[in-house]
């Protein structure tokens, strides 16, 4: 069964699907983000391969990560994207490989999601593959990656740097065409990443609130109450550290006055 599973991953049946086009222009229409920041972040991801988007709650880190990947791929191709969220109980078994119970409680060997996408990328070297890890700082990152942790480094990529995994005894390496983007809130100091080994393997890019973005100004200026609330939030942010600032994404969707009041009362006020 293990052999058949490997063969299916390395030699998948070709499926022809339509993927919606997505480029830089569309990104900048959908995301309140400056063009120079887009160019900088895109270049950082492609050059360094491992990037963590950090920032206060509500700045749109996950939203930005997903759409940045779309724009790099040139289309909304979910087949080349792994999205996962880390948490305290997330394990190496789920991420890399291990024995897990099936529907009737029998433990069977299963490949984890990261190992599967690495196998896909290895079999398709002309295309880029992306791993988006939401709340990356909420999991025990070194344990989740396990033996593969060192292999995500730029100079440790490729088949020449393979390791033998303890569980399956299979040879494993992280292909050159796999890119890892993590997101993390800087709001909770208890979850701050202080592990030097981790910081050495990732670049950290800070996402700031976009209240000064011209497109966002045009959006909120259409509603007098929203304009008043945004102005108040901007003033509050001046007295807050970068880690505690209130993000703009609370106000990005169309809202009537009642929605705005509820957002302020139940989402914004608890933060301050």
PLM region spans:
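Extended, composition-driven regions rather than compact fold-specific motifs
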Residues: 251-255
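Aromatic- and Lys/Arg-enriched surface recognition patch
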Residues: 1
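Extended, charge-rich, solvent-exposed interface segments
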Residues: 4
